[in-house]
Amino acid sequence: DNAEIEKILLEEHEKETHHRRGLRDKRQQSQEKNVIVKVSKKQIEELSKNAKSSSKKSVSSRSEPFNLKSSDPIYSNQYGKFFEITPKKNPQLQDLDIFVNYVEIKEGSLWLPHYNSRAIVIVTVNEGKGDFELVGQRNENQQGLREEDDEEEEQREEETKNQVQSYKAKLTPGDVFVIPAGHPVAVRASSNLNLLGFGINAENNQRNFLAGEEDNVISQIQKQVKDLTFPGSAQEVDRLLENQKQSYFANAQPQQRETRSQEIKEHLYSILGAF
């Protein structure tokens, strides 16, 4: 009858359900057994090769941090060290068009006068104390504010533009200062001084030193130009340059007679005043 048929169908359904549940349990047990597997050394090496060849490698390498002091300093002697990474050396800096540098100046030492041809450098004092001196046009922050009423006023302003002025400031940890392009600057350390700099417009920038035995742009000037440019003769300028045996960093401690120091100081001011 119908009741007997329903009973048989129900039993068959229960058997089928029980069979499926058994198969599922067996698969689950098999998967659990294979959670921890033993991998050979050769398999590990193959996996490592595949990981290194991933397309993500180029992306991650561009975002990796770098250490400024991991390479040799560009300028170095017993008085200081200068480290720098430029866009040519690090692709991370190419799109930003900046360079990053780090300067260590020993106590009582001087980072010799120099200027950047294109770059504007933002410098922060990490550690130590000292002072810096920057040479720029007199009243250049007020240029363009005065109206040109007559020819005499125009001539006076033109003469002012051709004059230079020295700007000085003390340096302490946490201070930030800006070095405009084309402005000579020198830094003296009253204690061990560490500076971190960021240069904007880094592409094709050149750092030109105005003092020191090496990379001194003044020593490359022809004799006839020196005679016309600097007070005194070209021989006096050459004699001053020859007396500077250090390059990039020098000892700022007075070790010579006061008259001799004053003579060098006056000549240095004359040279800076010509720019």
Curated annotation (Swiss-Prot):
Compositional bias (Acidic residues): 147-157
Primary location: other
Annotated region (Disordered), positions in chain: 1-71, 134-164
Residues spanning the membrane: none
Biased composition regions of type Low complexity, renumbered to the chain: 50-63
CC terms in the record's Gene Ontology section: aleurone grain; vacuole
Pfam families (alphabetical): Cupin_1
GO molecular function: nutrient reservoir activity
Keywords: Seed storage protein, Storage protein, Vacuole
Classification via InterPro entries: Cupin_1 (IPR006045), RmlC-like_jellyroll (IPR014710), RmlC_Cupin_sf (IPR011051), Seed_Storage-Functional (IPR050253)
Subcellular location: Vacuole, Aleurone grain; Vacuole
Ranges of biased composition (kind: Basic and acidic residues): 1-17
Highest taxon of the lineage: Eukaryota
Boundaries of every Cupin type-1 domain copy: 66-238
Functional note: Seed storage protein.
UniProt cross-references to PANTHER family, sorted A to Z: OS03G0336100 PROTEIN-RELATED, VICILIN C72
Family, as annotated: Belongs to the 7S seed storage protein family.
Protein name: Provicilin
